[in-house]
């Protein structure tokens, strides 16, 4: 078996529920060596509690956790599930995300992958403080919308994808204008990804004997109620799980090196003059195969 991939997760967990699914997927994946989780984007104390509670449920309080830079809106969608969780009880809580990213990368004997599934404030702050981190790390990024291939019905044609649109300046400072090697997972492959009812029910069943999955499902149901989600059996879109999958394997995904540039409307374009070269996932061979993998992984079958 290959040595596990050293990983940092930078996440806006606690807003959309797919970040929680992504964290659970990481924690269930022996191919990944999660060393640090950093929170970004909105109500940082609340978001950091969401991450801490899931890490604790998985028995992984050895993973370092660092709050990042916040902003608006609050988007406290699973606050009911978080309850009165005491963040000070988390044993590996660090002071701030940018310094934690720098320290983790610079003190690693191996190149680290930073999986970015939220806005890019923490990356921008870390890179501007210590550009040398790009030499010992690479980025896997959920962001962008290249050909709108999987997004019909979800987004207007050529719209700006949320992780870029929520802070375009952070995208430019943390991604486009850096020396980082970037692997991009746009909406072309992450859009419209969800588990149909039989798969979701299987995950629910697994939660009866797995504390992490039990808490994931409980928080998901709170999210449904808070967001007035018209629940009819399947999950909501699980965009960020595609980023985790790409950190585990490239099988089933088709990549192409492309120069990517986000314009002032946050629309991601293929632009040979202004774009940064990125390895971009554009299509699936078989999306159903991914659904089977995700379900089996969360259920502890593989």
Model-derived features with residue positions:
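N-terminal acidic, glycine/proline-rich low-complexity segments
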Residues: 1-302
């Amino acid at each position: 078996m290959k040595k596990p991939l050293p990983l940092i997760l930078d996440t806006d967990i606690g807003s959309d529920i797919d970040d929680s699914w992504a964290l659970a997927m990481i924690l269930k994946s022996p191919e990944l060596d999660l060393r640090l989780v950093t929170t970004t984007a909105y109500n940082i104390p609340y978001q950091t509690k969401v991450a801490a509670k899931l890490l604790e449920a998985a028995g992984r309080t050895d993973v370092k956790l660092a709050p990042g830079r916040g902003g608006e809106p609050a988007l406290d969608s699973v606050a009911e599930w978080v309850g009165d969780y005491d963040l000070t009880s988390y044993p590996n809580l660090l002071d701030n995300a940018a310094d934690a990213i720098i320290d983790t990368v610079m003190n690693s004997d191996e190149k680290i992958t930073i999986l970015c599934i939220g806005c890019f404030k923490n990356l921008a702050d870390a890179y501007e403080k210590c550009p040398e981190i790009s030499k010992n790390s690479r980025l896997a990024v959920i962001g962008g919308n290249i050909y709108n291939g999987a997004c019909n019905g979800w987004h207007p044609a050529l719209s700006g994808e949320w992780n870029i649109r929520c802070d375009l300046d952070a995208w430019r400072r943390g991604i486009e204008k850096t020396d980082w090697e970037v692997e991009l997972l746009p909406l072309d492959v992450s859009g419209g990804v969800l588990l149909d009812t039989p798969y979701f029910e299987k995950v629910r069943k697994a939660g009866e004997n797995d504390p992490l999955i039990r808490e994931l499902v409980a928080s998901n149901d709170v999210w449904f109620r808070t967001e007035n989600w018209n629940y009819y059996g399947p999950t909501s879109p699980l965009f960020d799980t595609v980023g985790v999958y790409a950190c585990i394997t490239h099988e089933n995904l088709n990549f192409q090196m492309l120069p990517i540039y986000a314009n002032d409307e946050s629309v991601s374009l293929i632009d040979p003059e202004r774009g940064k070269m990125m390895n971009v996932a554009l299509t699936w061979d078989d999306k159903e195969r991914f659904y089977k993998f995700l379900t089996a992984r969360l259920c502890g079958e593989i």
